[in-house]
Amino acid sequence: GLAAVLPWGLCFALFKRIARWQWLYGVQCREALAQALQRDCCDDADAWLAERRLVTLLDHADHYLLRTRSVAWIERHVQVHGQWEPGGRAALLWTFHWGTGMWALRHARAHGLKAPMVLAAPSGPDFVGRAVFGLYVRARMRSVDLALGEPVIFVPGGMAEVRGALACGQQVVVVMDVPQDQVAVTRVTPLLNVPVSVPAVLPQLAVDQSLPVTVFYMGVDIRTGFR
């Protein structure tokens, strides 16, 4: 919550220092580093881990920044490449589980898109005995509601709402890198020369209905904190 109370420049400088703490997000970072080394995506393990921790800190901070900063403030800190699909027409907006994407949702809404987001329901084994974690996840989902101005569509069980939104000429935001065990139908496709499983239902829906698809992501300049 430091991002909610500190000037952003000071907060980001503090985050860069905190990201050097080797114990921070220890298990998650070690698992991620093992994957990066396996895929030959890492030359300097210490630098890679510091960046991984920084991106995680920023991902958490964006929840609080979205709640406490104006659209104008956010847009002053974002450099945009490309454009959104025009509003008023059904379309799919695809993105990925890569930190710092919250501001992109606010940007989409500010540019006229009506786009509910498809998210996994906050339930299941990951939430058992983790009350604080559950409250935080639900608060983040509320931030997604606020960013887009549309209620989240929860899955499983949300396909009727997805079809309804598309029938009303809305866009639907979909995160495509979902674990194989969390979706019923998948397809194998190459990514960075590695076969990966991706959800198949919504891509097939896009083909069947000739829906425009816009792929978007929001990166971060780790020197400045700009997106």
What are these regions (language model features)?
Residues 89-154, 184:
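Catalytic core of membrane glycerolipid acyltransferases/transacylases, capturing the structured
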Residues 1-102, 138-143:
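Membrane-anchoring hydrophobic helices of lipid-metabolizing enzymes
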Residues 76-82, 149-156:
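Short acidic-hydrophobic, aromatic-tinged amphipathic segments that line or gate anion-handling sites
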